[in-house]
Amino acid sequence: MTFAKISQAAYYVPSQVVTNDDLSKIMDTSDEWITSRTGIRERRISQSEDTSDLASQVAKELLKKASLKAKEIDFIIVATITPDAMMPSTAACVQAKIGAVNAFAFDLTAACSGFIFALSAAEKMIKSGQYQKGLVIGAEVLSKIIDWSDRTTAVLFGDGAGGVLLEADSSEHFLFESIHSDGSRGESLTSGEHAVSSPFSQVDKKDNCFLKMDGRAIFDFAIRDVSKSISMLIRKSDMPVEAIDYFLLHQANIRILDKMAKKIGADREKFPANMMKYGNTSAASIPILLAECVENGTIELNGSHTVLLSGFGGGLTWGSLIVKI
């Protein structure tokens, strides 16, 4: 039987660093105000690179690490809420930029859960036996959709991309998963609203591209629903919580990680964090964190670690995977 494994991880972030002090010069905020509430100290902001540019850098690095040619890739999935355009897909742009002539490519939109949803879908595709190698990338240029006059959202987000190479393997690595959506609460986090508009419509409404968030509702959702889902998944696995080596969670807020560790009953030291440097990068946050953990030696891609990956955000969406990495 064919299974899927994560064989490589890579990330790329824009070079421009925007600190909390930088933000305090253009809005009513301060380093202390932002850090005490979120843990975020700085973020990367793109100056000219679009989402496909960031994702392509990740794709090239994955190929380099694996000593593969682009033509050997079977598929490319890009999880994003900030595509270059609605058409062509960002994934198709990546396919063209790296020369993956044999790959089919598509985008997946599930906000901050996007990488988890994409990884779950890609694993099934490899497991079908029809595909051998795929790139799964989370990439965002959130600075495109931020209202820079709104300090409640502008201080939170950053730009970046991360991804993995998924390959066929004879051993099982993806052990358990739990994927959820609740559209009835979707108004808590929105962006990119396009009004119905034509010479034949009678709707008097304008487009609104900016991201809007009910911060308290999203915070409560993460602590209540997501931590419950993670606990239920661990119980479903018949593993003790201690058997999970690392919890790689979406990097939204340091206080969410603190509270989730307590709710789950896990050692807080097993929850690495990097939102201090990058802010909330939505679909890119988990793969960036994974790639950094591999880079610094915390995690080795040799199947020796049991890792729980979990994303949560707009939709509402949330999902977790227990993976041997």
UniProtKB/Swiss-Prot annotation:
Annotated active site: 112, 250, 280
Cystine crosslinks: none
Identification of the protein by name: Beta-ketoacyl-[acyl-carrier-protein] synthase III
GO molecular function, one term: beta-ketoacyl-acyl-carrier-protein synthase III activity
Membership in a protein family: Belongs to the thiolase-like superfamily. FabH family.
PANTHER family according to UniProt: 3-OXOACYL-[ACYL-CARRIER-PROTEIN] SYNTHASE, BETA-KETOACYL-[ACYL-CARRIER-PROTEIN] SYNTHASE III, CHLOROPLASTIC
Annotated segments matching region ACP-binding: 251-255
Gene3D superfamilies: 3.40.47.10
Subunit description: Homodimer.
Organism of origin: Streptococcus mutans serotype c (strain ATCC 700610 / UA159)
